[in-house]
Amino acid sequence: MSFRCSVCGYVYEGEQLPDNYECPICHQFGKFEEYSAKKEEPLDSKEVSGPLDLSYDSQIARQDESCRYMKEIHEMAVSGKSIHSSMGTQMKMPGWDDILLLGAQLNPLPLDDGEEVNTTTVIGKHAKKPLIIENPVFISHMSFGALSKEAKVSLAKGSALAKSAMCSGEGGILPEEKAAADKYIFEYVPNRYSVNPENLRTSDAIEIKIGQGTKPGMGGHLPGDKVTGEIAAIRGKKVGQDIQSPSKFPDIQTKEDLKELVEELRIASEGRPIGIKIAAGRIEKDLEVCVFAEPDFITIDGRGGATGSSPFFLRESTTVPTIYALYRARKYLDACGSDISLIITGGLRVSSDFAKAIAMGADAVAIASAALIASACQQYRICGTGMCPVGIATQNPSLRARLKGDAATQRVANFLNVSLEELKMFARITGHKNLHDLSNEDLVTISREISEYTNIPHA
C-alpha cells in the first residue's frame, strides 16, 4: 500500500502506516492518506539485486532526545550525505526579549499619544543620491529561485505600500519585482547576475554581498529542480542545472580591490549608495577592510538569521549572535569616527526588536523571516526541498498557485505599517520626537551576560 502526505506529497510505501508516523520531509504528524498510483509489476525477487538497505530496524529503532545529535547521526549514517536545513537555528541564544526599553516618566518626560514622530531613514547620507525611506525596517535579500515569483512580487508590493524598501537577493533582478518596489536594493554577487549599466543606474542602492550569517564563507546553491526557464534566463544558466555561487569574489583579494569595486559601482550607478554585507565573524577585522573601502552603508548579518537551505552543522556552529555583533560593529565605527550607515539583520522579528536595535546604534533593520511569516509562511522549515506547501519557497506551479498574491501583499504591508506605528510608540514613551534619537540610555537588560559584553546596563 501507499500513503501520501497531504502537506508535502511524500509517499510512504508499506503494508501499514506506523502509528504517529512523522513525515521525513515536512515533519508533520497525522497528515497521511491512502494513495493509489499505477506501478510497474515488480520483477521476480530472485532477479532483483537492489542496493543495501541501511535503514534501522523499525521494530527496535528509537530516538533519545537526551543523546546529543542521535537523530542527525542516524540520518547521515543511512543517507551518506550531509544534512541541510532551512530557516534559522533553534539553539538558545542571547535574545532581544532579554533587553528592555525604559519608559520615560518625569526625567525625561514622555511625549503625548499621537504626537508626531519623525521616522525618516537615510541610508548613505553622503551619497549623491541617498536612499531615503519612511520606514527603517525593510525586506532583506532573498533570491528569486529560493522564493517563487509570486512571493517575490507580493513582498515588493507590500514593502511599497509601507514606504519601505525591497532587496533583490543573490539571484539577479526579477523585473516584475523591481517594478513593484518603491525602493529597490540590488545585491551584487560574484556571479554578477543582472549586472548591466541600466540595472546599476535604476536601482536605489547596490549592496556587495561578501557573506551571510547562516553560511559564512560559503556561496549559495540552487538545486536544478528549482531552475525554471525564467530563473535560468536571469542567471544565464541552463534549465534544470544546479547553480553554485562562489564563496568569494575572485577579483577581491585586498582592501584596495574592494575599495576599487565600491568606487566603480558608485560611478556606474551615478551616485547611488553602495553597501557591503558581511556575516558577523571577525567583526572588527572585517570592518577595518570595509571602512577602508569607503562604502555608504554596511550590513551585519548575525547569528539567528535564516536561509532557504544551509548545511545543518555549519548553520548551528558559526556566526556571532546579532546582539553582540551589533554592539561590536557600532563600537568599532564610533571609535574610528565613521558615519557609514549601519544596517543590522539576523533574527529580528517585531517592533520591539527593531526599536532596541535602533537604540543600540543601527540606522535600519532588514528582515526576511518576519516578512515571509507575514506573507504566508507557516514555518514548515522545508524550504530547501522545493515543496513549500504555501507556495513561497517553491517553483512547483501547483504549489505556487496556493499563494494568493493580493492577500499576501496586504498582509506584508499591514505588518510593516503596524511595526512602524509601534516604533513611533516606543519613541514617544521614551521621550523622543525622532525615532533615531533612541539610544543606549533607553535600554536595560535582565541578562548578566548581555550587560557584561555590551554597554547595556543591568536592570
Please place each PLM-identified region on the residue numbering.
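Residues immediately within or flanking Cys/His clusters that coordinate Zn2+
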Residues: S2, N20, T385
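Short, cysteine/histidine-rich loop/knuckle motifs that typically chelate Zn2+
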Residues: S6-V7, P24-I25, M387
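Short, non-ligating residues that shape and space the ligands of small metal-coordination modules
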Residues: V11-E15, F32-E33
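Short linker/helix segments within small regulatory modules
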Residues: G14-E22
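Conserved, well-structured core domains of diverse proteins
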Residues: F29, A37-V137, H141, A146-K157, ...
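Active-site-facing alpha/beta catalytic cores
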Residues: A127, E134, H141, A146-E264, ...
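Glycine-rich phosphate/ribose-binding loops and adjacent secondary-structure elements
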Residues: F249-R400
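Gly/Ser/Thr/Ala-enriched C-terminal appendages of enzymes
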Residues: R349-H458
